[in-house]
Amino acid sequence: MTYLSSNQLKQYEDKGFVSPINIFSKDKAKQIRDEIEMIEKEMPGELEKSGRYNAHLISPLLDEVTHNPKILDAVQSLIGENILVCGTTLFIKNPNEKGFVSYHQDAKYIGLDPLNWVTAWVAITDSNEHNGCMRMWTGSHKENLKQHDQNFNEGNLLTRGQTVKDVPREETTPLILTAGQMSLHHPTVVHGSDLN
């Protein structure tokens, strides 16, 4: 079982996220990427816009990822054993294409209450500062929900372009992950990612 260590639990409590957590081998991560690329090739447009939500419903392999015991055990460490997967989203950021995620809080637009849930993000390719990895505003989960503007900027992968303004980049932490690793974050931590 991949229950989180006491240090990881403290990181989540203090910072609003925990990362990295080893889930898959690089070979398994490549198999998942190959599956996504096969869907893109054989069903053009299927994973674009609203099609990128709940892709686990069209792919047995992606469904297997969604119900992976290592992921569920880590989530259970934070929220307990009554786990409901309420959705999956693919954020596909191809090199040299416009694609970023504006700084936002998941709780602002997902609408689940109480805020005793967690977002799991699994990297299927290496994610680092050179290719626009996710950044967390460390400790921002301890504050109230922030005002979000809707900025429909070209390339923003969020449906409404929901954006928290004036995020101090020097207070953000890049989540450096290798393919097959995961991060977990609190629903009110402010996070986003740059262009690939």
Language model regions located:
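Non-heme Fe(II)-dependent double-stranded beta-helix
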Residues: 1-112, 149
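Hydrophobic/aromatic-lined pockets within catalytic cores
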Residues: 79-80, 125, 188
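Hydrophobic side chains in beta-strands
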Residues: 92, 122-123, 136
